[in-house]
């Protein structure tokens, strides 16, 4: 047996890309509800209004500072298309979708709760009962099929009211608001949910500060404060979760990429080292329990003030994450030299193409060894249980006239990734809890806002402008993954 009997198999989704029902059931707006569609070459945009009535849209550029014009606040503006408003309509299709997951044999279903569906303004004293009831129905449906939920509390869904009133996570008010929200849902769903993640890809605070922290001014200091406030909030939620139910386990979620030097020049290796430090800073704090010296020296050099409190660091040290989960799709090649071909894509921008690997239409290299590298790196550094909670292939699938979708390219990608995981476990001794692919069912691409960049095992009839029946069609990969799960990863043919 390649994986232990308790190994969990499933798929992952996010409310802002999948759920829909953006103005139903008492839900308030969140950060992504004002984010337009885009493409591989056209960035998504945050739409805004000013008090004088002026409107506009600011491109969301990954890996760079983001700032709205002075006086602008995020808002829905006529004439723009917002793909998150409907997603692929899990809100009305949850029974059908969970049944499809059960047919594949899912042990686990990773989903996020829409914070503003529970607390429309993010910090309301009392919860929205319709929102609580919706997730009750979802978790009950999961329970009916023996599927365990893995719930992300915040997957880029910062309530818009907290952004417009406080400027997002740079303000310490959001610590208390998030803990209040977590307290409500952890008490309400006690016995239905025991696995929780606090913040999706917490290092998005650096890579995409509007998405990761609801920051409308993504300056270095605001990003540093936003990260610190999320670390403190996470520690408080770990403490709270254990008090509410000793069976609760709260994990970190990190966006991981392997970094390779383009040459053997030591300066290329130093560039790789710095890139890894920028990424692993977030897990050094949230999972490791302490601020690393390299980041403290950076803040000192740059004159960054965190607006912190002395007790913050005691909390961070005492209540680190119980386990470390992560997303991993690809690897990056870095150099201080010129190169013939630059890499493209929102997660590989700034690097160069790897001559040993093929890339997909969105510029992401297909790396068959990246998960083994990631798992060993994180296990050796932290020695805490690991969980791969996002890993998949985005592609423009074709729905045939007979309703079939032949996605051998996805099967080939996932086969290589599972083999890589297996080597990390059986050869290297990594403690791996489970695997949830991205994604269970087609949804809106976070990076580009497209539908044509599909990840799921189930095709959803919806296009880039929101047209389509929303009918579900299992792909070839659906039946392949069912076989993989049934064999606990032994049958990958």
Range-by-range predicted roles:
Residues 93-114, 318-324:
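Catalytic domains of carbohydrate-active enzymes, especially glycoside hydrolases
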């Amino acid at each position: 047996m390649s994986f232990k009997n308790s190994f969990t198999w499933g798929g992952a989704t996010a409310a802002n890309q999948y759920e829909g029902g953006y103005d139903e059931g008492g839900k308030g707006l969140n950060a992504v509800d004002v984010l337009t569609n885009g493409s591989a070459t056209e960035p998504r945009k945050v739409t805004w209004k000013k008090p004088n009535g002026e409107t506009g849209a600011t491109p969301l550029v990954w890996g760079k500072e983001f700032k709205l014009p002075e006086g602008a606040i995020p808002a829905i503006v006529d004439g723009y298309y917002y793909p998150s408003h409907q997603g692929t309509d899990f809100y009305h299709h949850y029974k059908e979708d969970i049944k499809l997951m059960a047919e594949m044999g899912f042990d686990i279903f990773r989903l996020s709760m829409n914070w503003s569906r529970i607390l429309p303004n993010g910090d309301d004293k009392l919860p929205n009962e319709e929102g609580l009831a919706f997730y009750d129905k979802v978790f009950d449906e999961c329970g009916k099929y023996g599927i365990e939920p893995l719930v992300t509390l915040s997957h880029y869904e910062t309530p818009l009211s907290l952004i417009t009133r406080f400027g997002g996570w740079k303000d310490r008010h959001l610590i208390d608001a998030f803990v209040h929200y977590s307290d409500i849902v952890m008490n309400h769903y006690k016995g239905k949910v025991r696995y929780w993640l606090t913040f999706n890809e917490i290092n998005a605070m650096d890579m995409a500060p509007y998405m990761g922290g609801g920051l409308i001014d993504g300056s270095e200091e605001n990003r540093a404060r936003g990260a610190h406030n999320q670390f403190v909030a996470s520690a408080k939620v770990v403490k709270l979760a254990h008090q509410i139910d000793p069976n609760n386990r709260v994990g970190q979620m990190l966006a991981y990429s392997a970094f390779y030097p383009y040459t053997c020049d030591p300066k290329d290796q130093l560039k790789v080292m710095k890139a890894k430090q920028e990424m692993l800073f977030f897990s050094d704090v949230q999972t490791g329990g302490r601020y690393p010296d390299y980041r403290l020296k950076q803040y000192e050099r740059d004159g960054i003030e965190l607006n912190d409190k002395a007790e913050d660091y005691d909390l961070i040290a005492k209540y680190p994450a119980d386990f470390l989960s992560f997303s991993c799709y690809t690897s990056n090649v870095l150099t201080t030299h010129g190169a013939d071909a630059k890499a493209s894509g929102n997660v590989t921008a700034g690097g160069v193409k790897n001559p040993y690997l093929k890339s997909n239409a969105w510029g992401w290299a297909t790396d068959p060894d990246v998960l083994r590298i990631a798992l060993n790196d994180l296990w050796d550094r932290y020695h805490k249980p690991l969980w791969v909670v996002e890993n998949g292939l985005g592609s423009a699938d074709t729905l045939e006239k007979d309703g079939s979708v032949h996605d051998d390219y996805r099967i080939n990608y996932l086969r290589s990734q599972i083999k890589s995981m297996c080597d990390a476990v059986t050869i290297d001794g990594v403690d791996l809890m489970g695997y949830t692919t991205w994604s269970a069912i087609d949804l809106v691409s976070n990076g580009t806002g497209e539908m044509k960049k599909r990840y799921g095992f189930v095709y959803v009839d919806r296009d880039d402008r929101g047209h389509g029946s929303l009918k579900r069609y299992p792909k070839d990969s659906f039946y392949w993954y069912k076989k993989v799960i049934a064999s606990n990863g032994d049958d990958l043919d």
